[in-house]
Amino acid sequence: MSYNGIGLQSVRGSATSGHIQKNIANKISKPGHYESRKNQKSLMSKRADEAKQSQNKREAYKQIKSELTKHEQLRRIEVKCMDLQDELEEQGVEPDEIKARVDELRKKLNNKEFDENDAKSPTTTTPQPSRKDKQLKEDLENENKNKDGVFEYKRRYADKRN
């Protein structure tokens, strides 16, 4: 029962099975172990930096998106104001009155957009459960009722056997 000259010649009389185990208690680390650990740490720090950069990109994207939506809202308001101005000019209304009406419309639309944005803010709205969520909840309740019926059957069956 020896392996490469290591171990017992014969297991007879030794009260052992002769199984040979590797001694890893005094194992010497491979050359370059420290460098590989150092490389792992640098790799982890690079990944953390990449995660921060991607988070920054997402935040920048959100900011740009909000700026674009705000610009789009302002553009729609100005288009409506220009339509009113063209219509009033065709009717032959005085320029001072045109300017006053257009300014009034612009203020009205800005206030309306501001009120809509307040209504859309996530702090004031509470999420409502969707139809799918309600359906899932009902399905789970029905499934639980069916399981209760199975257990009841098992109880009745067990009572009859005794």
From Swiss-Prot:
One of its GO terms (cellular component) is cytoplasm. CDD domains: cwf21_CWC21-like. Residues 46-69, 109-119, 130-162 have a biased composition (Basic and acidic residues). This is Pre-mRNA-splicing factor CWC21. Associates with the NTC complex (or PRP19-associated complex). The NTC complex associates with the spliceosome after the release of the U1 and U4 snRNAs and forms the CWC spliceosome subcomplex reminiscent of a late-stage spliceosome. Residues 48-150 form a coiled coil. The lineage of its organism: Eukaryota, Fungi, Dikarya, Ascomycota, Saccharomycotina. Disulfide bonds: none annotated. Belongs to the CWC21 family. The keyword DNA damage does not apply.
